[in-house]
Amino acid sequence: MKKLLPLCCWHSWLLLFYCDFQVRGAHTRSHVHPGFEVLASASHYWPLENVDGIHELQETTGASRTHNLTVLPSHNSTFVYTNDSAYSNFSATVDIVEGKVNKGIYLKEGKGVTFLYYRKNKTSCISNPAQCGPEGVSFSFFWKTQGEQSTSIPSAYGGQVISNGFKVCSRGGKGSVELYTHNKSVTWEASFSPPGHYWTHVLFTWKSEEGLKVYVNGTLRTSDPSGKASPAYGESNDNLVLDLTKSYENRAFDEFIIWERALTPDEIAMYFTAAIGEQLSLSSTPPSFSVTPTVNTMAPTNAYHPIITNLTEERKNFRRPGVVLSYLQNMSLSLPNKSLSEETAFNLTKTFLNTVGEVLRLPSWTAVSEDSAVVPGLIDTIDTVMSHITYNLQASKPQVAIVGSSSMADFSVAKVLPKTMNSSHYRFPARGQNYIEIPHEAFHSQAWTTIVGLLYHSVHYYLSNIQPASTKIAEAANYKNCLLSATSYLISLEVSPTPKLSQNLSGSPLITVHLRHHLTQRQYTEATNESNRIFLYCAFLDFSSGEGIWSNQGCALTEGNLSYSICRCTHLTNFAILMQVVPLELTRGHQVALSSISYIGCSLSVLCLAITLVTFAVLSSVSTIRNQRYHIHANLSCAVLVAQVLLLISFRFEPGTAPCQVLAMLLHYFFLSAFAWMLVEGLHLYSMVIKVFGSEDSKHRYYYGIGWGFPLLICIISIVFAMDSYGTSKNCWLSLGNGAIWAFVAPALFIIVVNIGILIAVTRVISQISAENYKIHGDPSAFKLTAKAVAVLLPILGTSWVFGVLAVNNQAMVFQYMFAILNSLQGFFIFLFHCLLNSEVRAAFKHKTKVWSLTSSSSRQANVKPFSSDIMNGTRPATGSTRLSPWDKSSHSGHRVDLSAV
């Protein structure tokens, strides 16, 4: 702290000096800094640091008020030496307040609580700001991150300041102030960057008609002018407490001051400059102010060297992005207000940006995109440093420009007189496909104009997973579950005074932003997927609320495609192209229609498949039904039946539950088994029609291994490696997000391709036979054989699933309906073509009926001759000549292909 000249030391010295001046009268008022008068008007003051006895608990009897400062009688005064000031050594007498617990302000510590503020009325202006009247109230303190508590400096440690009326806290890399009025039940809240390793001054004011304002290091950072209704306040403390939170880092407080009125911006500026030991020059138009250096106007490069060196050394200890951000923010606020030569400004800019670039490459930053506040906060800090450099850049000629490149960004720092600009526009960068252009007519000021340009090289990689609800992009908020991500470089341009631009996007002049897209592999895959809609937004980081929020207000995308975007904007700031990928969703009408088709079709299929299995079981004694072809039909029917029953049941379970997860595993197995048996159907058809090989018995065990064993193996592997992918998304099925769905899609696509090939080959053979039959017999019905064969084979080969591949977007809606109809009715078509309309099944059923009839009559007439054993064995009895069907004619024609398999 001594090394860096902390702000709190100046504050302590100034207050002690002023108290000594009032008590002893050793000086004249003409030499007093105007900030002393602001300090003297305070209602209460606690030094907290470097004050012996501050941790002792004492009774406050006979407390008196002197010079508007809360003090004790002189015999309780504490004599303080402040000998660590970089400017001079002084000693003075300061009186502090100490008293009973439950009466005011406290320090929370491991050994207990130290009393600091005594007030008989618990509903005071401090504990309830509504009691302050129209004058309002102001609270001021210094705050910083403290790594380890020092035993030699009894600072007040804590992570928050709380009372019954307000709370100041720092959590997760974000500072905030909350203020509550009990009579109207209204809460005011404002956020700001929390302190880091440097002392940071926080001052906030509140007035009923102005609301809450938060000043950090003398500058207004954020505000809440209106507040919001709040029936209950989260904390309940009649006293003011400096609290030690459970955060991983400690924070130290110093110089706590209360004014029972709202300070003006000028008063805040005077007080802050007095605290840091600078002279104040007030302008005629408050609240702006400038700090006038007390030394020569030119500062050598080494005036900034300690800060850069310290940053380079400290980054070795950085592990968490929030800590890094706090450190950089406080470093940016501690830069000296000294003039910079061009060489010094260039070295400082490049060193700072290179250092930040090295910090971004730390392993802890790989997941920083999950924290939406860290990267915008870092960008805001960089803007602060660059603005400081530009403001202090010494202009020795009408145009001063510093242009360079670092590992972090390309940069341009310029200070120019607009009248010396000869071109029709100002462009940054001067070359390349990523740039911002400002028309010359927008530069209306005749005074010095500062321009800061930054083109970040890799920050866009960290601008992903942006929640639409946390942005000001209304269009993106319509798809709250679809995250935003940057697809271009982040480019920044700041001009002061602000250019005069049209406030209407249809007017002129406007800013032109041209950005090339740099898509990751994942972004490109999603953008080119026809099942997704892509939205591109010209967005910028809006820091008006104290934190960076993405917005597209005042910007419009005028031209572009997947490679680039051109935007027109009414303002300057940090720009990037954000992409939002929205999966295509069906309208409510289509969803209801497709769901109804699925329910009705699956229910009908379940009934038909059950009838089919019962029919095959009853007719299993007939030889024509007992062959391998009908065994395969029965196994396929069983797999499809169980899969569709489970599918209907799964609609009743909530995703993410254990039953839903179990159902997803069973659905995976039985649907995969259904596809496997479709493959068996194709292989068996190929062996019977195209290439006859082996006996049925030799292939039997292979078919069962393919139909039931292979799907089981795939499911076991999938469950072992992707257990969490089952039943966790929108339904009881495999997750689409992590690739687990390919454990079903890949085998299914393979089977569809194989079966389509088999279907084509079989269709060619049938077509040849049909043509031959037409030539020999002249039967025109033979041409119908091809169409009939295809219709019969489609349900058992599963080729109708190809419509699922074609149904990828709203433009292919007809394929979605075809897919829903054909696949939900797969069981019905199996029953129709391979049971109800199948000539062999009908013949077997007739024979079985005759057997039942003869068996029944034989029990009544013993002399009735039993039915032929051939019929019992399933062989066809000799019958009279019948007209040959086209298929029978084909066998008589001498063709060696057996089409009974079809």
Swiss-Prot record:
Residues 870-884 have a biased composition (Polar residues). Residues 111-304 form the Pentraxin (PTX) domain. Gene3D superfamilies: 2.60.120.200, 2.60.220.50, Rhodopsin 7-helix transmembrane proteins. Disulfide bonds join C538-C567, C555-C569, C660-C732. It is found in: Cell membrane. Residues 620-630, 683-702, 761-788, 834-902 are cytoplasmic. GO terms for cellular component: plasma membrane. Forms a heterodimer of 2 chains generated by proteolytic processing that remain associated through non-covalent interactions mediated by the GAIN-B domain. In the inactivated receptor, the Stachel sequence (also named stalk) is embedded in the GAIN-B domain, where it adopts a beta-strand conformation. On activation, the Stachel moves into the 7 transmembrane region and adopts a twisted hook-shaped configuration that forms contacts within the receptor, leading to coupling of a G-alpha protein, which activates signaling. It is a multi-pass membrane protein. Residues 538-585 are annotated as: GPS. Autoproteolytically processed at the GPS region of the GAIN-B domain; this cleavage modulates receptor activity. Cleavage takes place early in the secretory pathway before N-glycosylation. Keywords: Cell membrane, Disulfide bond, Glycoprotein, Membrane, Signal, Transmembrane, Transmembrane helix. Adhesion G-protein coupled receptor (aGPCR) for androgen hormone 5alpha-dihydrotestosterone (5alpha-DHT), also named 17beta-hydroxy-5alpha-androstan-3-one, the most potent hormone among androgens. Also activated by methenolone drug. Ligand binding causes a conformation change that triggers signaling via guanine nucleotide-binding proteins (G proteins) and modulates the activity of downstream effectors, such as adenylate cyclase. ADGRD1 is coupled to G(s) G proteins and mediates activation of adenylate cyclase activity. This is Adhesion G-protein coupled receptor D1. It comes from Bos taurus.
